[in-house]
Structure formats: structure tokens, C-alpha cells
From Swiss-Prot:
Motif mapping: Q motif: 9-37
Enzyme Commission no: 3.6.4.13
Organism encoding this protein: Photobacterium profundum (strain SS9)
Name of the protein: ATP-dependent RNA helicase RhlB
Domain Helicase ATP-binding, first and last residues per copy: 40-219
């Protein structure tokens, strides 16, 4: 039975270079997602594209497939030097750059092409060594790429393919001047294949595309609704005093297999982490203060199931491919309505269902009208029974301390995942047909 997120378009029918198809087959990719089915037939002809689709729809595989295919069918010039990559893939964050590199691994193995990573937060020497040996594909963030360019570690004169991923996020983070700097150091747009992908093709993104690309064709996959039809949304109005107790109560009732909790500040994230760690949850923290190597390790632990809950600022809300996230909690409603969509888009991916639970607290309830206007529907409201919330919670741990192993309130002293923690209070939720006025 065909699932809703896969089309009838086969990769085998696209005329791909055999070793590219081999890499796709090795990972079980046989049918295209909608963005792949629309983008690949266009870009494989050599036409530049500007693609838009919801997160989790296969944008990364689309541009990786096109990049590898183009490089294999269009050999490098004889004048190319060792420090000149043939393709460059730019991402707004270190985490996304690493994710793209990991996603490229099967194609690297099947084609024999080489790739290198360039991002901040890690020592220069290790990355420099890779580029000194020569790579075909450069994947990285703009700041470190510019550093390497100015130090002559890399040269962009032989670039044949350019990919700009999460272009709208590039604007949000103020990287557009860096991108334009790099574009001006590459061959002219007509001398290379250019691909831009974004969650939204806003006016400023389109302007960038037409300025530095060769008449790109727009490829748009419109969602059924901005928040995704497989995501069950829910909203609570907690007081500031009950907010943490409500979160911990919901977590114990739901026992999410894999959850992300978003907060608006790093200090709030640390506070949430401290409460959950003290309660012996397997929880990780991801914010701007966490060293890069630790961030990578935390993401790996979360992806592999060694961590059940990830507490994060919006650094984790865009671009990362974390499979099977079952729940997203907006502990704080985001200030930007678009960030609400990107946050809850961590769940309900690739045809799976998911749950999004948001708190409209005293501090951030003011953001709710703009969010509901942007998503074009009210978030279903639920009430809760204050008397049913957990109490006598342990004091939160400080970030520098190691979470203790003993002293759990639950029977058997650990999470069993089979309803052994606390009976579900069926009176906790009282769904409302309309949002409170």
C-alpha cells in the first residue's frame, strides 16, 4: 500500500548515474517523495532550482542525489588544484552541516567521491588536513568556509555545483553577507549548477536566488496545512507556578518514546534540564553554550535512543533529521510564529504521526494570536486539574552536576515504560471545542 509521503516516481526511472542509484538502493530509497519527484527531473537536466517543502520531506536527499549525479557526469577540468572542491553545500548551523555529511555517506561509499566538513567549534587542524588531501564536496557553515578561503586552505575557482540549504534560516541568522561573499569567489552562475532549498520561498529568498543563480525554476510542495496534518496539537494555559509541574505530569502520563522540549532561552532550557535530570529522566541539553563535540554526542545519543528527552533552544528546530520524534513540547511559545511550525515539524515526519503540546503561560501567551493567525487555525485547547499535578518534586540539579541514580519516587526505581510510574489521571485533560476568550 502506497504511503502518503511517497510518490509513484522511481529513482531507477530518472536516468541516474549507476553508482548513485547503487547508493540509494543500499539505503532502501526506491521511490521519491513529492519534493524529490518534482525537483530531480528538473535539476537533472542542468536547470537551476529553488525548492520549497516542509521539513522532513526529503530535501536533503534531493540535492545530494543531484550533486553526486552532476559531478560524476561532468568531470573536473585538468587545471583543477587539490585545494579546489567541485561542489559546495552551505548550511546555517553546524548540526545541519554534520547531518548533511552523514546523509551523504552512502553516496560517498558507492561513488568514490570525497567530502569534507568545515564548521566552527572544532579545531582547524583536523578539518584542514582533510582539505589538504583534496575533496570533491565541501559541506559546511559560511563562517568557517570563509576562514578557510582567506587562509587559502580552499579555493572556490573550480566549483561546479552550489547548494544553499535552509536559505530562510540564513537570513534569520544574518549570514547573507557571508553567502554573497562566497558566491562572488565562485565561477559565474551560468558555469555551475545551483540549488536553493528553503522551508519558505519569501521575497528575500527569491531575490537571492535570482541574483546568484541562473534563472532558477521554482519547485514548491504545498503542505495540506502549515503544521502538517499528522501532528496532533494541544494547548494549555498554565500559571507560571504550575508550568513545570504540568510538564512533568504530562511526561509521566504520556511516557513519550522520543521528545523534544523547546524553550526560548538557554537559561530556561538549563532549568528544565535540571528538573528532569533530578527526576531521573534520560535527558539531554542542546543550546549555544554546549561545546560542539558534546552537542554532536548528545544528538547521537538522542537519535540512537540512549536519551529520551532533548531540551533545546531553536538551534535544534531547523534542518536536523531526527527520526521518530513522538512528542514536541513548547514549554515557551516562540516569539516568531514561523518558529512554531519549525519546532513542531520535528514530529509527524515521513508519514508518521506525532503530538505537539504547547504552554501559553503568563509570559508568552501574548505570542499565541500571531501563531494561530500564521497557521490559520486555533490550537485545540485542553484544561488540566491543578490538584492532579505531581507534587513533592525533587530540587533541580545544577548543570555542572552529574544526575544522581537513586532516590526515584517510582516503583522499582527506574522507568519501565509499562505504566508502572503513576496511574493516568483521566480527569487531567478537558478538551475544549474553542479557545478560551
Amino acid at each position: 500500500m502506497k504511503t502518503t509521503h511517497i510518490t509513484e516516481q522511481k529513482f531507477a526511472d530518472l536516468g541516474l548515474e549507476p553508482t548513485v542509484l547503487e547508493g540509494l538502493d543500499a539505503q532502501g530509497f526506491h521511490y521519491c517523495t513529492p519534493i524529490q519527484a518534482l525537483a530531480l527531473p528538473v535539476v537533472l537536466t542542468g536547470q537551476d532550482i529553488a525548492g520549497q517543502a516542509q521539513t522532513g520531506t526529503g530535501k536533503t536527499l534531493a540535492f545530494l542525489t543531484a550533486t553526486f549525479n552532476y559531478l560524476l557526469l561532468n568531470p573536473a577540468s585538468d587545471e583543477r588544484k587539490t585545494n579546489q572542491p567541485r561542489a559546495i553545500i552551505m548550511a546555517p548551523t553546524r548540526e545541519l552541516a554534520i547531518q548533511i555529511y552523514n546523509d551523504a555517506a552512502p553516496l560517498l561509499a558507492s561513488t568514490g567521491l570525497k567530502a569534507g566538513l568545515a564548521y566552527g567549534g572544532e579545531a582547524y587542524e583536523k578539518q584542514q588536513k582533510v582539505f589538504a588531501e583534496g575533496v570533491d564536496i565541501l559541506i559546511g557553515t559560511c563562517g568557517r568556509i570563509i576562514d578557510f578561503y582567506k587562509q587559502r586552505v580552499i579555493d572556490l575557482a573550480s566549483i561546479q555545483v552550489v547548494v544553499l540549504d535552509e536559505a530562510d534560516r540564513m537570513f534569520d541568522l544574518g549570514f547573507i553577507k557571508d553567502i554573497r561573499f562566497l558566491f562572488r569567489r565562485m565561477p559565474a552562475p551560468k558555469a555551475r549548477l545551483n540549488m536553493l532549498f528553503s522551508a519558505t520561498l519569501s521575497y528575500r529568498v527569491k531575490e537571492l536566488a535570482f541574483e546568484h543563480m541562473n534563472s532558477p525554476e521554482s519547485v514548491v510542495v504545498e503542505p495540506n496545512q502549515k503544521t502538517g496534518h499528522l501532528i496532533q496539537e494541544e494547548l494549555f494555559y498554565p500559571s507560571n507556578q504550575e508550568k513545570m509541574r504540568l510538564l512533568q505530569t504530562l511526561i509521566e502520563e504520556e511516557w513519550p518514546d522520543r521528545a523534544i522540549i523547546f524553550a526560548n532561552t538557554k537559561h530556561r532550557c538549563e532549568d528544565i534540564w535540571g528538573h528532569l535530570a533530578a527526576d531521573n529522566h534520560r535527558v539531554g541539553l542542546l543550546n549555544g553554550d554546549v561545546p560542539q563535540k558534546k552537542r554532536v554526542r548528545i544528538l547521537e545519543q538522542f537519535t540512537q535512543g540512549d536519551i529520551d528527552i532533548l531540551v533545546a533552544t531553536d538551534v535544534a528546530a531547523r534542518g536536523l533529521h531526527i527520526p521518530q520524534v513522538t512528542h514536541v513540547y513548547n514549554y515557551d511559545l516562540p516569539d516568531d510564529a514561523e518558529d512554531y511550525v519549525h519546532r513542531i515539524g520535528r514530529t509527524g515526519r515521513a508519514g508518521e504521526s506525532g503530538s505537539s503540546i504547547s504552554f501559553a503561560c503568563e509570559e508568552y501567551a501574548i505570542n499565541l494570536p500571531a501563531i494561530e493567525t500564521y497557521i490559520e487555525h486555533p490550537i485545540p485547547l485542553s484544561k488540566y486539574n491543578s490538584e492532579a499535578l505531581l507534587d513533592e518534586l525533587p530540587a533541580p540539579l545544577r548543570l555542572q552536576r552529574t544526575p544522581r541514580q537513586g532516590g526515584n519516587r517510582r516503583p522499582n526505581g527506574n522507568r519501565q515504560g509499562q505504566g508502572q510510574s503513576r496511574p493516568r489521571n483521566n480527569n487531567r485533560r478537558h478538551p475544549q471545542s474553542q479557545k478560551q476568550q
